[in-house]
From Swiss-Prot:
Residues 1-34, 96-106, 175-196, 299-305 are extracellular. InterPro entries: ADR_fam, ADRB2_rcpt, GPCR_Rhodpsn, GPCR_Rhodpsn_7TM. The gene is Adrb2. PANTHER family: ADRENERGIC RECEPTOR-RELATED G-PROTEIN COUPLED RECEPTOR, BETA-2 ADRENERGIC RECEPTOR. Its main location: membrane. It is a multi-pass membrane protein. Glycans are attached at N6, N15. The modification Phosphoserine is found at S246, S261, S262, S345, S346, S355, S356. It comes from the Eukaryota. Disulfide bonds join C106-C191, C184-C190. GO terms for molecular function: adenylate cyclase binding; amyloid-beta binding; beta2-adrenergic receptor activity; enzyme binding; norepinephrine binding; potassium channel regulator activity; protein homodimerization activity; protein-containing complex binding. This is Beta-2 adrenergic receptor. Palmitoylated; may reduce accessibility of Ser-345 and Ser-346 by anchoring Cys-341 to the plasma membrane. Agonist stimulation promotes depalmitoylation and further allows Ser-345 and Ser-346 phosphorylation. Phosphorylated by PKA and BARK upon agonist stimulation, which mediates homologous desensitization of the receptor. PKA-mediated phosphorylation seems to facilitate phosphorylation by BARK. It is found in: Cell membrane; Early endosome; Golgi apparatus.
Amino acid sequence: MGPHGNDSDFLLAPNGSRAPDHDVTQERDEAWVVGMAILMSVIVLAIVFGNVLVITAIAKFERLQTVTNYFIISLACADLVMGLAVVPFGASHILMKMWNFGNFWCEFWTSIDVLCVTASIETLCVIAVDRYVAITSPFKYQSLLTKNKARVVILMVWIVSGLTSFLPIQMHWYRATHKKAIDCYTEETCCDFFTNQAYAIASSIVSFYVPLVVMVFVYSRVFQVAKRQLQKIDKSEGRFHAQNLSQVEQDGRSGHGLRRSSKFCLKEHKALKTLGIIMGTFTLCWLPFFIVNIVHVIRDNLIPKEVYILLNWLGYVNSAFNPLIYCRSPDFRIAFQELLCLRRSSSKTYGNGYSSNSNGRTDYTGEPNTCQLGQEREQELLCEDPPGMEGFVNCQGTVPSLSVDSQGRNCSTNDSPL
């Protein structure tokens, strides 16, 4: 989102460029421009490289092709478009002290900027709802939200985001009426985003605040349910060990099943924390800007131009953070390492007993005599011993079907996030 007003030179001269020696001042300005250009280039490269890596990893490795990760792809696409079509032109606008791409591209660029932010926050909102359904209605989850339905949801998110971003800007509903704004609209070299009060408030509420409130409310509920499940695991685990200590000493299989189930549940709750970090980071990066965006149109000149632009760029930098956050997930970490040739791509075993072969397909390589399920191996396998294990199977994900293996253990599949 372009800066309000035309005072974007502050990034070019730390001391106001008022040194008595003109040559010294010019050298400082040039050094500052070079430094800012390098910093902005690093930001653009980090955004593009990181999000291309995320999209490629999910597209290549079946293990990562879960419903939740479809939404992650949508989020990565929004960040990638931000890195390719928004941030570079914003950097040019600041470094060149003027807009060099004409009025049409100015409005189109601004529309893309609003589109990416809106699509990101709405996708995060959908992810929160997705996790809420998965953790509260595990038996219904896979029938409620299939991969095809997820694609439809993603399409709807982008359509709604497009309508709320392109329509008001291309129809000029956003335009202010004071002289400085009108002059900028007609000037080819000016691309400052002057808006009227109604648009600034309405667009901020629709594109950011409403999805943010929904996301925070739903995800707080998800964590409450997850906390209760972890407490249930602790109680059941203690009860199991007390009742079956002698059996565990004679045959370690039951204890192994419990530890494995507990480990699975903890892994799923760690995935929830990862998604929570993604949402929290997005909020911290963009909330200050949207607060300032409303304050600016209510009280003009109250917010310094420097603050407005810096907060706008704090939001841009958020697009580079998500790929780093995904590295909390062992599955994403391994996929990234294989794509970057830091790990051999054949028969590398995941921590949960899966291995990824050279064609990106995931196979289970755990214990012998495992459950034979007639479904794709991209789904997580969870085999549990019957005694005392009620409630562990649906600790986070879904249990569409149960089967029993040769050792009498209950088996289930789960569409795991991240």
